[in-house]
């Protein structure tokens, strides 16, 4: 708890599994939400 470096070593190695799980869901979700909201404004 004295240095920030020891905390960063414990916090940051979770970059592969959690990062892929979050972005594997979040990136297509944001893309489809943007596509659906864009479709609302298309006039025929």
Swiss-Prot record:
Belongs to the PsbE/PsbF family. It comes from Chlamydomonas reinhardtii (Chlamydomonas smithii). The keyword Ribosomal protein does not apply. Keywords: Chloroplast, Electron transport, Heme, Iron, Membrane, Metal-binding, Photosynthesis, Photosystem II, Plastid, Thylakoid, Transmembrane, Transmembrane helix, Transport. The gene is psbF. The keyword Electron transport applies. One of its GO terms (cellular component) is chloroplast thylakoid membrane. PROSITE patterns: CYTOCHROME_B559. This is Cytochrome b559 subunit beta.
């Amino acid at each position: 708890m004295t240095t920030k470096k020891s905390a960063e070593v414990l916090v940051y190695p979770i970059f592969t599994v959690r990062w892929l799980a979050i972005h594997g869901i979040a990136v297509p979700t944001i893309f489809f939400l943007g596509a659906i909201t864009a479709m609302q404004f298309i006039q025929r």
